[in-house]
Amino acid sequence: MITVDRKTIIQILGGIMARPELLSDIDKYQLEPSDFSQQLDKFVFSAIYNLYVGGAEKIHATDIDTYLGENDIAKNIMERENGTQFLLDCEIHSEPSNFAYYYRKFKKLNLVRELQKKGYDVSNIYSEDPLEENHFSINEKFEKLNTGDILNQIKGEVADLENRYVINTFVKEGTAFDGVKDLIASLQI
């Protein structure tokens, strides 16, 4: 199953820690807990979101650690997965000015993962296996794609199948005035 690499996750979470106002820019960025596959990341994202909604303008690792410490499940996950160090990595190693790049990469990988979950063959879109023969060329193309391009590729494949297997699909065209004279004549007494 395709996963998003930890460095990209660090850039995403660190970027919104430094600039939580990005969460309000819903025309450009749409993030939600389900975008993250690991439980720790979901808790961290939710904490950042809730701190921002509560009025925080810049969020530090200690803010998130304190916030999650109030939830026993989150606290246990933080302890088990070295969450405090992860938060510090997000704070220190992210570059908020590169957020847009990492966001696009993050969303593309999530889309491909979702397609894979639904049973689509994504091997011609993205390759996780560096030993695969076409790994480099596939991923080079992937870098140039956006989510719309990926979905259009899938739609094109489905349209090809539809053209091959769906028979007798035609559309009868007309206008709003077709049959109006007959209707008026039938209504006159």
Task: Locate the predicted segments by residue.
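Charged, low-complexity surface segments at secondary-structure and domain boundaries
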Residues: I48-N50, N139-E140, V166-T169
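Bacterial replisome coupling helices
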Residues: K7, D65-Y165
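The Walker A/P-loop phosphate-binding site
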Residues: N152-I189
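Noncatalytic partner-interaction/assembly domains of nucleic-acid and motor enzyme complexes
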Residues: M1-L109
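Generic preference for flexible, low-structure residues
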Residues: K28-Y29, Y52, K118, V122, ...
